[in-house]
A protein has these predicted regions:
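Immediate N-terminus of the mature polypeptide
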Residues: 2-13, 22-304
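Short, linear, compositionally biased motifs with a strong N-terminal bias
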Residues: 17-18
């Protein structure tokens, strides 16, 4: 419509708390040559976890009431969550490559600021390792208020990426806009049990339908990994509208079923490279029909 004025107001709120700069663990002053450890066939002995909270209270800049309270509230990542992501264990031959890859695996977590794995003691062919990690603040509120073209939109939610130090992510969100109202719940874990399987579940209850999804994926988690596999299932039912001059002019109901599965193969690390093959199958079915008790003319696309 010509001459129509549109006013947009947006408000966003987020609380993000980060730790201070990473400092080397106290034991880092003991330096051991990784190549020498490997050449001498060093065996991994004790694996010590050195876990730091979000804020370093030994730093005067971070030692205040607010940061002390944040550290008190925050649950530091549990030992078992760290250990199950290591590519080695006590009794294995020491490998600098596996230590470096384990650091990479740990750093991929949203709830960790950094990770360092350092040999700290070597005697009689046995090397002890220090695994130093530092947590990030993991609870993030979500709040967004906006107004566009006379219509209000509201989003409110909570996103916890490290529930009680378990490494599990939980997200709850309530979203209301001109198209639909949604209540969304998501839960995911990158390492289910003691496995390398990453699983996620999403449930959304909408004013015009629903949206459900589940996935389980075992990735190539290291350079020498020999296989990967995964499945994804998605079911979605919603009302869609067609607009003319900013107003709803027609509508239809869409039902979608999406399923996929894949399998990957590899001979593992060969020299300095790894070659991988992946094959999969996808089923994607979209069906369209009239909206039950609809108030607008139906404009129904062809199924595909």
């Amino acid at each position: 419509m010509a001459g129509t004025a549109s006013t947009i107001r947006r408000f966003a709120f987020a609380f993000v708390a980060f730790g201070g700069l990473w400092t080397e663990p106290a034991c880092a002053e003991n330096s051991y040559d990784a190549a020498k450890l490997e050449a001498e066939g060093a065996v991994i002995g004790e694996i010590v976890l050195d876990k730091a909270n979000v804020f370093d209270l030994n730093d005067p800049a971070e030692n205040n009431a607010f940061y002390r309270l944040a550290n008190l509230i925050h649950v530091v990542t549990k030992d078992k969550v760290i250990r199950k992501q290591l590519l080695f264990e006590s009794g294995d031959a020491y490998s600098k490559r596996l230590a470096d890859e384990s650091e990479r695996v740990l750093r991929q977590n949203q709830y960790l600021f950094d990770a360092k794995i350092t040999p700290v003691h070597y005697e009689n062919g046995v090397v002890d390792l220090n695994v130093a990690t530092r947590d990030l603040w993991s609870l993030q509120p979500e709040l967004s208020l906006s107004r566009t073209g006379g219509e209000n939109s509201t989003t409110i939610g909570l996103d916890e990426s490290n529930l009680l130090g378990s490494g599990t992510r939980v997200r709850f969100m309530r979203d209301e806009d001109v198209d639909r109202d949604q209540t969304i719940f998501e839960i995911s874990d990158r390492h289910v049990g003691n496995s390398w399987v990453s699983a996620a579940i999403r449930y959304a209850d909408n004013s015009d339908g629903h949206s459900h999804g589940i996935s389980a994926v075992r990735p190539f988690h290291e350079l020498d990994a020999r296989w990967s596999a995964g499945v994804r299932l998605w079911d979605d039912d919603r009302r869609e509208a067609l607009y003319e001059l900013g107003e709803e002019a027609a509508e239809y109901q869409q039902e979608r079923e999406y399923y996929s599965a894949f399998r990957g193969w590899s001979k593992g690390l060969q020299g300095s490279h790894a070659r991988r093959w992946t094959a999969g199958i996808v089923y994607d079915d979209n069906r369209f029909g009239p909206v039950v008790d609809g108030s607008l003319p139906a404009a129904i696309p062809e199924d595909r």
